[in-house]
């Protein structure tokens, strides 16, 4: 099969995305490939002074119904589906000539339906019929026909044509066929998701339910993983077809061993947390929980403070920065501790050179900027034979909407620390407690079945790290059901608390804070994380 190259004599071009169209047509013509085309695609090729035959002239049947019917014809599909050496006589009898290459991309259904003013009629008019049919015909017959669905594929396609003097290999045809079927599947899934979400078709703008009756999601494999959650499990990482800029799925691995399942779970937690901060920040994560978070004047300051929170847990952790990682900080980290993964938007050349001395350390770059703050719109979690779907927890609060519920109000400095702690606690597994002071974590209590134990653990962590809790603040991801959590915090020296509120015993909790001289803010927002 490796030597199965076939020449391209005729190509049919019909594209909604005209990017690179004229350049592509010129190269095809240079190899004496006859061009067929439709509608606007043919017009652009012709206006460039290049010869092209309209499909309507080929079929003898005009485009009709405002372009809804133009390629649904045996001459077109027979030209794509005809098998060399099997269907030759039938094709000759009916005057059907082979089509060896199909260049086609579909009507932009997802882009049109994403517009706020898209009506149901607009959506229906954007459903491509002839395009998917041609893609399926060409892809099914990959033994003879090649098909490209995106301008991104043109360079490789043309490179092979040029290298092999107008011929394409079986491997290339098969790979393009797989991509075409994937493209059609994604397209049909988008249509299904949209129509399944329409709850009232009679309004000017169709009312749509947030969760469609049938959910069809498409993901693309980025890489196979070293192993799954445990070494006896296999794993792979798939990304959205259109990943949000600045999210983990856009990473580039600059060095290091193959990533594992746990590496990526932890990396996502670290990256999403560090992206919340405007000033230089460092987040160290272990087992999907932050074990140290800090903001500083530079990466080095932020790392030193984050590491000091829990040096024991930081060993073998994932470390994320929201600024360019410099060589001095990289050297300081690697000379001090074992690191599984580094994440940063950029790295100094000297920092990468030093990291290269530790060849197994994984170094990920995620291009990011202030404009790249998008996150997942929905979260998914597999359960037995099912899938839980929820809107992502993207709720942010501003300090001016916080409600002081105690006699004592927090100072301006305490409010800044409370806002810092509140940003961090969102990324800690429930029940979650964060002690913080001076824009750094002092102690973190994560994943306990009772909130009071998380508070106690945060205090224990601070004591183990020889960090003074006195004067610190505390954040809780959910309300305190009893006063015991406040009592435990007061015993360690906490002076201000931020929590959602909403407990049946809020009055008891507030009274406890007043007894201990603690200022308390209610956010009205819970941040459970499981």
UniProtKB/Swiss-Prot annotation:
A Gene Ontology cellular-component term: cytosol
Assigned keywords, A-Z: Hydrolase, Multifunctional enzyme, Purine biosynthesis, Transferase
E.C. designation(s): 2.1.2.3, 3.5.4.10
Family annotation (Pfam families): AICARFT_IMPCHas, MGS
Name of encoding gene: purH
Xref: InterPro entries: AICAR_Tfase_dup_dom_sf, Cytidine_deaminase-like, MGS-like_dom, MGS-like_dom_sf, PurH-like
GO molecular function: IMP cyclohydrolase activity; phosphoribosylaminoimidazolecarboxamide formyltransferase activity
Source species, domain of life: Bacteria
Record domain MGS-like: where: 1-149
Catalysed transformations (reactions): (6R)-10-formyltetrahydrofolate + 5-amino-1-(5-phospho-beta-D-ribosyl)imidazole-4-carboxamide = 5-formamido-1-(5-phospho-D-ribosyl)imidazole-4-carboxamide + (6S)-5,6,7,8-tetrahydrofolate; IMP + H2O = 5-formamido-1-(5-phospho-D-ribosyl)imidazole-4-carboxamide
Protein name (record): Bifunctional purine biosynthesis protein PurH
